[in-house]
Amino acid sequence: MAIIMVQVSNRLWTTQALHLACALARGSHAHLVLLHLRRAKNPGLLGTGIGIDPLTDAECDDFTEYRLIAEDYGVRFSLQPMEYVTLAGALTQAVETLEAGILFADVPEHGHSLWRRFQNWQLRQRLSSLHCHLYTLEQPPRAEDWSPSVTMPAIK
């Protein structure tokens, strides 16, 4: 069973990525995994759950909405929580563990677009070795020119 993974980020980004992922999952009968990353406050406690704040009411409401979106598309959906120290390491480990073929990830903006492009390139290289495609929903400089979309390579 193919797996499409969506990293939970801000509500708008996650909703847009989720709609795109659901459309892809419905067309390919893939399973959708929503990856909820929680930064570990103490790397020594990683994986123990100690020191991780409980979900807020707003987060619970968001997860309910995300589940309803997946149900509207008729897509199998699951939520996967994960503690992490570095974002790139967590994304790579999640893809490797769950054998995801597609990952929608929100790589944080940094002051320099060159640095962000390098980070995206590096993450793409890691994921490529795992046979996983990365989609980031990058926006052009003018926000009014942007709409959420995915360009898929031609099937050979």
Regions found by a protein language model. Give the residues of each.
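Small/aliphatic-rich secondary-structure junction motif
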Residues: 2-48, 130, 155-156
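Short, well-ordered secondary-structure micro-motifs
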Residues: 17, 44-47, 90-92, 115-116, ...
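General small-molecule cofactor/ligand-binding pocket signal
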Residues: 33-35, 78-82, 133-137
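Acidic, proline/glycine-rich short linear motifs
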Residues: 36-61, 145-155
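A glycine-rich helix N-cap at a beta->alpha junction
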Residues: 55-78
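Structural beta-alpha unit
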Residues: 72-103, 121, 141-156
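Glycine-rich, Arg-bearing micro-motifs that act as flexible, cationic patches
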Residues: 104-126, 144-145
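Short, acidic/small-residue loops that bind anionic groups at enzyme active sites
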Residues: 106, 124-139
